[in-house]
Amino acid sequence: MRSRRDAAIPAYNRAGVEKVGVFNVSAGPDSPTLYVLLTHKSLDSVAAAADRLAADEEYQKAGAEFLNATSTDPSYIRVESSLMAAFHGMPKLDVPAMKSRLFELRTYESHSKKANRKKIEMFERWEISIFRRTGLQPVFFGETLIGTRLPNLTYMLVFENQEAHDKGWASFIADPEWKEVRSKPGFTDAEVVCNISNVFLRPAAYSQI
């Protein structure tokens, strides 16, 4: 924890990543798992990040214990990464102001890239605005370019607590406009989504999101 708080996060900030989110699994598969969210302004920033950290003497010193861990006492088991492109309808991260934060990370898989693009269109045209109107507060929406279970899209919502989560989703599901949208030909669940998974996350004390 100390290496992430004192070494990695400041180093990413120096490398141009404005906000670093660090989350622990509250409910979901593969627990215990640590989730880290990094936002970049360009693909060049993504490509240069590793070299920038490697050249950052302050990071190398502050994170020495983590970086120089031995095979008999590793700092982690494995790392899995995904690269996402922000939706046009929400190009920037919306950092929540609330003190108590429960995050829900949701992934929608599709049977084809065409279906995946239709689901993204559905969000862009209708769902994002319905989310906001019914009390669901998005943090980001991303089209997964590189990762597992492709093609898919992933988004994150934030709530003050479980009660707010349940209330927000109930309001969304009951919304007349949403009922109309989800029944439109070409946009029904059967046509655009083949699997939905979610995980609940709590931010680490030092998370910037």
What label would you give each PLM region?
Residues 1-60, 65-180, 185-209:
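Short S/T/G/P-rich N-terminal loop/turn motif that feeds into the first structured element of a domain
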